[in-house]
Amino acid sequence: MNKHAHSYIDSRWFEEYQKLSAMPGLSSFRADNRMQEKHRFFKGEIENPTFVYQSLAHYPYEARRNDLRELKKQIEEQEDNAALKKMYGVKIEHKINDCNIIESIQRKDDARYDELMQERYGSISLEIGIAVIRAYCSALEKVIETSRGNVRDAAKELHAYLDEVKSRFHVDSVHEFHLVEVSGAQEKILTARGIKKLFELKRKEYGLSDWRIEIDLWGRSNSISVRHKNKRVVIPRGRRLTRPQALALAEHELGVHVRRREHGEATKLALLGVGLGGFLWGEEGLAKYYEKQVYEGAINSSLKSYLLTALILGVDGRKRSFQEIYNVCELIFKSMKGRYFLTEVKSSKHYAWGKTVKLFRGATGQTKGVCSRRQLVYLEGYLRIKEIISKGILTEEQLMRGKYDPANEAHVLFLKKLSVL
């Protein structure tokens, strides 16, 4: 528990919930044999990889699930505050869902995994999907007009592919997206040390004196991560970003994720520091919104992830395999790298492999249309937050009050009853 524990209205339940909620998250679902499968895939020995998650093989999901159900039962029987009881019930059900997800991975049950992913993250929005495809087609037309050689050939192939997808369904959409040109030719590329300096400035700006910014010298991940438990933001030593990108990510990680954690812990509700059930859309949507205020090109990654997930799930009625999405990723790299997105990866095949593996995380890789679906959250959450801010429904101070979804009416009503909002 933290320094505010004495004033929490949920102190009776929070500590026990925290103990039981500690389990592998989706970001840790990395196939143990991914390097072997990568080698076989590149040699053409297999059409699609078969991922094995041995590190999850011995996780006691059944015992943890039973303990969570017992805690939920205790809260239902002993908690007098009906609204608090409901919020904890929803949060615990999310953790039970996590146990079910781990079980489906252990059993290599793609059908069950897909069912649970849909339960957690929902289905693809056809309106958003068609708008994203149109945005890609429009951007590719510019590439075709202004490029030549291999870049133009890849753009023409990808445009033809997406145009065919688009022709299979006709949906009106109120959404209109544009990929932002982000050429970094004139931008200075920062190393991990340079990125750390910018993060330190942002940390001081927000008065986050308890937090540390560190460079990870040994980790393999290329993603900047926030580790709330010991108040650290970790930057991989090989990370390279332009100055605008680094400033935007500092706003994303420190300005939103860390500040919401700190502000949530300072309220009377301990759960608000770790997140109400279903808070992710608000959390990532707000982070993307503020990131985009600093760096317009930040929206491109969300559009790309939504496009690829939509193709996997079959936005046009045809589900797709690992191999087909890998091919699309290669074409994106060849036709749009340097113009619509920047990456340190120099090889199209290594870029495509890394992106596709992330999309199919948790699945075996053998079943068309089965992927993590988590990538849907970023663009959908951004659109929800954008609407709330444009309508002035909540102030910036209220948006940052803790980890909840400002677009979730139940969250807002609950927090207003507690006078947190």
List each model region and its residues.
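N-terminal low-structure segments adjacent to metalloprotease catalytic domains
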Residues: 1-156
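Post-HEXXH active-site segment of zinc metalloproteases
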Residues: 58-64, 68, 244, 259-283
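Contiguous, non-catalytic segments that form substrate-binding/exosite surfaces or channel walls
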Residues: 82-241
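Primarily short, surface-exposed interaction patches in extracytoplasmic proteins
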Residues: 195, 218-220, 233-235, 279, ...
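Secondary-structure boundary elements
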Residues: 201-210, 257-265, 289-301, 391
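Short alpha-helix carrying the canonical HExxH Zn2+-binding catalytic motif
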Residues: 245-259
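Post-HExxH zinc-binding segment in Zn-dependent metallohydrolases
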Residues: 273-317, 381
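Conserved alpha-helical "signature site"
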Residues: 301-421
